[in-house]
């Protein structure tokens, strides 16, 4: 087995994985940068004084890491200090542009630089992208190969084999990084030894299923899910010829790649067959060849290098096939037949043709799985089940009674003291709401932030024949589960499950949009309480398009364990000077959501422990917590955006969300995130024209998300590639 793996790797994989890095000469730092440092930085970071042991009086283009730190400090508003003279907005923008040019020109020595990492797209200041009208005409993305997503890899395996045994026996070779947010970036992943070993084993599993057969009634027959052409070649009485190998390779190419192999490829696979058949087992040799087709780069990566001669600006347009694959995997987890048919017929040659077919594909279904996938990664609500919590909790008004019962509810308890925590159901409800808004496809972002409707404890009953689906209850009470605990509808503020959905939120327990969905609130909480810091950071990064400094090494980010105080009171420790320079970007954005518990339940007051009363209560000699109500402070503030219409105090989460939804900046930042998801990279200053046009198209279409996607997928930045 190991010998065959080495043969496959040397014949098929190795030639495709060899890459050559190109580097450019580093330009000298220009006079403008030196002047800026001398004027605004050197007094505290020069020969006479080195605050933080940082010396900038001789900073040059060779000091790339130092320049990165300077850029981050200036971009985040941490330097110059407030008490020092501040550069004008125009000068600051110009300086950041110059630094970006120098840092980009410096290269990365094969390493992925910070500005290319997911969740670091905001390193490009918003003003550089939307501050002034950008000229269009030369947009392009870097030429690249992009590893398949886990879902797309499964789809590729499904094209190769229809056997049910395959899907359950494959190991995922292409797992994404375990971080929140948009994670499938082209430059982030590469082939390594463990990945290669998994791919080889998976290929063997797929081919075994393709070739699976048995002798029955004296005849060699295929098993369910096998490929007839391959099964015939596994017949013990058949001698496999070169012509059989050529036909089998062509069949595998058709299944996996929708391509015909070239003469050179056919010759290479014949040579591989001959090498493997030297031990006399020609059937096993053929299986190795079929595995090799599954292991070639085209089966596991998307190639985006462009075709033909480069234009005057060094751009090459994606070939029709490259474009068909790029469009397919932008909108789906598998190849979309319409795109490949259009490529075969020469109907992906112009931007107008691409726009027509993209619109047609988007209009055929309620929503593409990749469209919903964007919102899942953007809002980060789907991680709610990963936040471990007790599976039941006391009703706000019956918390002390619930604590006494300790979750034990005999049949004679006729009333509800608590409610169930069912995070998987909460995620389904939120996704149903997003799909509903996407189906309407108007003013999408505003509705996502401010809608007063929701789905509750929903399950879809699908009638495939009639192509309809109806809402039913996911959780239903019965004699075994109707003891002391309310159904999941309680979390949303309903007294009973609403039959007509999406239902309007009860006015006495209001909530707006995704940020007040229980799934989002739970996903942005801790095991036992709310997390204003995480919620505020999400708003700062995903809606305001700014960055939050990373937690310094050696700092223990903890608040006092004082359950007899409110969370806001306990968080006063973050106002300390050494903490506040980071927390000022997050806390006041997250604290208004104290309107809800960490289970996502609306509340009018905050329950805290009453130490004195708790000392007097016990159950079977075990102490019992007793709670008292404290006044709820729901105020907050938006700061440091540079937009006077956005900055300022808010009285509660509702005012906060409405102000964000009304903001032009928030809409533009949303467009930036959509760009990252569909392009698999962070935006750069060169993408300003693409982003501005996408934003205009979104506004002029009354907030159509489909129109926004069409704008991006028909932009020059999507259609053209440029060698770096």
Feature locations, PLM:
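N-terminal secretory signal peptides that target proteins for export/translocation
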Residues: 1-3
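Sequence context surrounding c-type heme c attachment/ligation sites in exported
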Residues: 21-93, 504-653, 657-661, 667, ...
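Soluble non-cytosolic domains of exported or imported proteins
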Residues: 27, 31, 86-90, 239-247, ...
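Extended surface/linker regions that mediate inter-domain or inter-protein docking
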Residues: 98, 112, 123-244, 252, ...
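Aromatic- and Gly/Pro-enriched helix-to-coil junctions and flexible linker segments
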Residues: 20-230, 255, 259-271, 275, ...
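Short secondary-structure boundary/capping segments
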Residues: 306-312, 391-394, 464, 595-600, ...
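Bacterial N-terminal signal peptides
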Residues: 5-16
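Active-site-adjacent structural elements in folded domains
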Residues: 234-239, 256, 273, 307-314, ...
């Amino acid at each position: 087995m190991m010998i065959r793996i080495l043969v496959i790797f040397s014949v098929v994989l190795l030639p495709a994985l060899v890459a050559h890095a190109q580097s450019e000469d580093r330009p000298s730092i220009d006079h403008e940068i030196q002047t800026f440092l001398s004027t605004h930085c050197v007094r505290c970071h020069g020969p006479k004084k080195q605050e933080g042991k940082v010396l900038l009086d001789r900073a040059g283009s060779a000091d790339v890491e130092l320049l990165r730190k300077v850029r981050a400090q200036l971009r985040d508003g941490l330097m110059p200090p407030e008490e020092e003279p501040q550069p004008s907005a125009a000068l600051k923008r110009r300086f950041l542009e110059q630094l970006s040019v120098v840092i980009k020109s410096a290269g990365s020595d094969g390493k992925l630089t910070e500005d290319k990492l997911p969740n670091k797209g905001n390193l490009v200041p918003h003003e550089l992208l939307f501050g002034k009208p950008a000229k269009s005409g030369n947009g392009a993305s870097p030429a690249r190969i992009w590893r398949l997503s886990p879902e797309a890899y499964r789809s590729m395996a499904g094209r190769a084999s229809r056997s049910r045994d395959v899907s359950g026996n494959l190991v995922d070779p292409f797992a994404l990084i375990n971080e929140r947010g948009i994670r499938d970036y082209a430059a982030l992943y590469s082939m390594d030894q463990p990945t290669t070993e998994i791919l080889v084993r998976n290929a063997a599993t797929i081919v075994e299923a393709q070739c699976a057969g048995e002798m029955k009634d004296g005849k060699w027959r295929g098993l369910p899910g096998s490929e007839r052409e391959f099964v015939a070649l596994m017949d013990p009485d058949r001698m496999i010829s070169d012509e059989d190998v050529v036909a089998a390779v062509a069949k595998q190419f058709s299944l996996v790649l929708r391509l015909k192999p070239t003469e050179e490829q056919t010759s290479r696979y014949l040579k591989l067959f001959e090498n493997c058949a030297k031990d006399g087992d020609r059937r096993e040799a053929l299986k190795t060849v079929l595995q090799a087709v599954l292991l070639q780069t085209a089966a596991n990566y998307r190639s985006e290098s462009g075709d033909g001669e480069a234009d005057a600006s060094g751009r090459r347009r994606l070939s029709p096939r490259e474009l068909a694959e790029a469009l397919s995997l932008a909108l789906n987890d598998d190849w979309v037949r319409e795109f490949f048919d259009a490529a075969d017929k020469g109907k992906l040659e112009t931007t107008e043709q691409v726009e027509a077919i993209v619109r047609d594909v988007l209009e055929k279904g309620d929503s593409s799985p990749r469209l919903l996938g964007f919102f899942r990664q953007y809002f980060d609500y789907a991680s709610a089940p990963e936040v471990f919590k007790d599976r039941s909790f006391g009703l706000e008004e019956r918390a002390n009674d619930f604590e006494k019962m300790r979750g034990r509810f005999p049949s004679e308890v006729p009333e509800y003291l608590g409610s169930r925590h069912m995070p998987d159901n909460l995620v389904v409800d939120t996704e149903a709401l997003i799909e509903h808004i996407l189906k309407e496809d108007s003013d999408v972002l505003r509705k996502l932030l401010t809608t007063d409707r929701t789905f509750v404890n929903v399950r879809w009953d699908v009638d495939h024949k009639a192509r309809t689906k109806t809402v039913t209850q996911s959780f239903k009470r019965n004699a075994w589960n109707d003891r002391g605990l309310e159904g999941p509808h309680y979390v949303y503020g309903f007294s009973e499950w609403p039959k007509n959905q999406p239902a309007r939120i009860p006015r006495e327990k209001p909530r707006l949009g995704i940020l007040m969905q229980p799934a989002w609130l739970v996903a942005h909480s801790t095991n036992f309480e709310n997390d204003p810091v995480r919620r505020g950071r999400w708003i700062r990064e995903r809606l305001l398009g700014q960055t939050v400094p990373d937690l310094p090494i050696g700092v223990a980010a903890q608040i006092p364990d004082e359950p007899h105080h409110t969370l806001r009171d306990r968080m006063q420790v973050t106002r300390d000077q050494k903490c506040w320079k980071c927390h000022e970007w997050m806390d006041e954005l997250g604290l208004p959501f104290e309107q809800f518990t960490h289970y996502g339940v609306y509340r009018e007051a905050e329950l805290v422990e009453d130490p004195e009363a708790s000392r007097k209560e016990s159950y079977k000699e075990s102490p019992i917590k007793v709670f008292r109500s404290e006044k709820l402070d729901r105020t907050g503030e938006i700061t440091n955006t540079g937009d006077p219409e956005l900055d300022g105090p808010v009285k509660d989460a509702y005012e906060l969300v409405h102000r964000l939804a009304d903001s032009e900046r928030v809409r533009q930042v949303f467009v930036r995130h959509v760009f990252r998801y569909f392009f698999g990279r962070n935006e750069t200053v060169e993408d300003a024209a693409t982003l501005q046009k996408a934003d205009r198209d979104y506004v002029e279409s009354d907030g159509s998300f489909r129109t926004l996607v069409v704008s991006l997928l028909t932009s020059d930045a999507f259609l053209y590639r440029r060698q770096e």
